[in-house]
């Protein structure tokens, strides 16, 4: 009723309904008052909705950078780099993004300019020239310069990845359908299989489709060389946060290296289609302190000596 009285006090309502106090008129005025009030609050509600949407998008983008070890739903960026090679790849990606964005904006702006400036309405008589030497030189030289600018850091990263420094630890990796076999030749040829943990055996703190029964364990700040091959078909040994993806080819040994300064567990997966269970070949690399690594080696060797490390049967 207060809404009706307030709106009736406006000049427009006083003139329109002067002297009319019937219930029908009162209901009509009430509906118009409610509609007016609704339109009054429409903008703040929309603003609140957009603020919440922007906040949610920012949360998804930022949260994707808060976890270094695993892929996340709705992740739109790389996993944060955990090795020297991945740090270089991350910077190179951002560098390429700036160049690509500039090219896209330039081409889109040029296309819009041409559509507006040289349409049939503005140019009823079309130009009759067939070529322009200066323009052709420009659009040939500029792409060459861009490619050279891109190639220099690209080759530098490739050289850094291929040139393996003096190593502190070597690990042999053998891919099978559908599990990984690891060998530590520097530690009495310690070897074990690594198999994905099934859903029924998964513990609350373990990650589905990523955790394994036996992880690779390496010490922090140690240069580790991986010698990679396969025993049946082609696989691919890939850990995104460490910046490597190396094919495991039967009869051939490929190699890569890494050095991780931060403790934690870093996950990867087989990245080469290798059969029906290709998607169930995760890789888990745990980085620990030097003391914990030595204790882990001693424990594994003791287990092997006691005969409690059975080989995985072919499946």
Swiss-Prot record:
It catalyses: 4 Fe(II)-[cytochrome c] + O2 + 8 H(+)(in) = 4 Fe(III)-[cytochrome c] + 2 H2O + 4 H(+)(out). One of its GO terms (cellular component) is plasma membrane. PROSITE patterns: COX2, COX2_CUA, COX2_TM. Binds a copper A center. Its cofactor is Cu cation; heme. Residues 6-53 form the RPE1 insert domain. It is a multi-pass membrane protein. The chain crosses the membrane at residues 41-61, 96-116, 133-153. GO terms for molecular function: copper ion binding; cytochrome-c oxidase activity. Gene3D superfamilies: 1.10.287.90, Cupredoxins - blue copper proteins. Its main location: membrane. GO terms for biological process: ATP synthesis coupled electron transport. The keyword Lipid metabolism does not apply. InterPro entries: CcO_II (IPR045187), CcO_II-like_C (IPR002429), CcO_II_C (IPR034210), Copper_CuA (IPR001505), Cupredoxin (IPR008972), Cyt_c_oxidase_su2 (IPR014222), Cyt_c_oxidase_su2_TM_dom (IPR011759), Cyt_c_oxidase_su2_TM_sf (IPR036257). Its EC number is 7.1.1.9. It is found in: Cell membrane. Cu cation binds at residues 235, 270, 274, 278. Keywords: Cell membrane, Copper, Electron transport, Heme, Iron, Membrane, Metal-binding, Respiratory chain, Translocase, Transmembrane, Transmembrane helix, Transport. PANTHER family: CYTOCHROME C OXIDASE SUBUNIT 2, CYTOCHROME C OXIDASE, SUBUNIT II. Subunits I and II form the functional core of the enzyme complex. Electrons originating in cytochrome c are transferred via heme a and Cu(A) to the binuclear center formed by heme a3 and Cu(B). Belongs to the cytochrome c oxidase subunit 2 family. This is Probable cytochrome c oxidase subunit 2. It comes from Rickettsia felis (strain ATCC VR-1525 / URRWXCal2). The gene is ctaC.
């Amino acid at each position: 009723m207060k809404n009706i009285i307030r709106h009736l006090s406006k000049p427009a309502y006083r003139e329109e309904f002067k002297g009319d106090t019937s219930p029908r008129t009162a209901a009509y005025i009430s509906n118009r008052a409610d509609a007016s009030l609704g339109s009054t609050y429409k903008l703040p509600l929309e603003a609140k909705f957009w603020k919440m949407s922007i906040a949610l998008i920012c949360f998804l983008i930022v949260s994707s950078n808060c976890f270094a070890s695993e892929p996340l739903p709705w992740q739109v960026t790389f996993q944060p780099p955990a090795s020297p090679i991945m740090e270089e790849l991350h910077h190179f990606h951002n560098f390429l993004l700036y160049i690509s964005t500039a090219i896209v904006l330039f081409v889109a702006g040029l296309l819009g300019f041409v559509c507006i400036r040289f349409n049939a309405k503005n140019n009823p008589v079309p130009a009759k020239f067939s070529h322009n030497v200066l323009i052709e030189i420009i659009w040939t030289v500029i792409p060459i310069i861009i490619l050279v600018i891109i190639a220099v850091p690209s080759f530098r990263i490739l050289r850094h990845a291929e040139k393996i420094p003096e190593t502190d630890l070597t690990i042999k990796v053998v891919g099978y359908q559908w599990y990984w076999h690891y060998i530590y030749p520097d530690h009495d040829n310690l070897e074990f299989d690594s198999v994905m943990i099934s859903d029924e055996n998964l513990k609350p703190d373990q990650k589905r489709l990523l955790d394994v029964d036996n992880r690779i364990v390496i010490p922090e700040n140690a240069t580790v060389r991986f010698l990679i091959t396969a025993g049946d078909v082609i696989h691919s040994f890939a850990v995104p946060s460490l910046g490597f993806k190396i094919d495991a080819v039967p009869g051939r040994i490929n190699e890569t290296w890494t050095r991780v300064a931060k403790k934690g567990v870093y996950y990867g997966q087989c990245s080469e289609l290798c059969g029906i269970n290709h998607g169930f070949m995760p890789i888990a690399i745990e980085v620990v302190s030097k003391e914990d690594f030595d204790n882990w080696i001693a424990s594994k060797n003791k287990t092997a000596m006691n005969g409690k490390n059975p080989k995985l049967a072919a499946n």
